[in-house]
């Protein structure tokens, strides 16, 4: 009887945890796809695609500390920078931290670097290293809304000259 109970309990645990792990893996892949889309759309200067996963009521802070609310402001700001100071730049990013706070909320922090600024054309008051790279730390909070992952918080800060920067891959 005791053996039957242990087998039954183990089976129930496996039954209820396997779909959760499988779902978390699927959600992780969906978020990873969004991160890859961010890079490819930035590199092609496509603000529409770059902004498509940003929530209607999302908030974001850019590298200058300016705060914005809403999808339209996020889109408008990226249209502006892709035509201006970040035109034809190249974004790369490495995931530093990725964790789920709940089945519907994930936090992703990336170390980013941007290259391709024209000589003397980098953004004012932002540190560009000796190799012409702007380094930032980007924290994004994702929330699952109606089955889709949306960015509800986007907080980007530039790394100051005395901040150690890990070696890029």
Model-based region annotation:
Residues 7-15:
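Bacterial N-terminal signal peptides
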Residues 14-17, 100:
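Aromatic-residue hotspot detector
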Residues 6-7, 98:
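N-terminal hydrophobic alpha-helix used for membrane targeting or insertion
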Residues 18-22:
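Sec/Tat signal peptide C-region and signal peptidase I cleavage site
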Residues 1-4:
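Positively charged n-region of N-terminal signal peptides that target proteins for export
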């Amino acid at each position: 009887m005791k053996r039957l109970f242990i087998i039954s309990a183990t089976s129930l645990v496996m039954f209820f945890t396997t779909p959760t792990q499988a779902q978390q893996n699927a959600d992780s892949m969906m978020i990873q796809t969004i991160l890859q889309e961010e890079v490819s759309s930035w590199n092609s200067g496509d603000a529409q695609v770059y902004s498509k996963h940003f929530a209607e009521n999302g908030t974001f802070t850019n590298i200058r500390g300016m705060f914005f609310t809403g999808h339209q402001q996020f889109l408008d700001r990226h249209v502006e920078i892709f035509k201006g100071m970040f035109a034809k730049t190249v974004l790369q990013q490495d995931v530093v931290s990725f964790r789920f706070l709940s089945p519907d909320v994930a936090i992703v922090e990336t170390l980013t670097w941007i290259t391709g600024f024209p000589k003397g054309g980098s953004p004012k008051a932002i540190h560009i290293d000796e190799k012409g790279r702007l380094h930032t730390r980007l924290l994004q909070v994702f929330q699952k809304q109606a089955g889709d992952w949306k960015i509800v918080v986007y907080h980007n800060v530039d790394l100051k000259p005395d901040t150690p920067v890990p070696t890029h891959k």
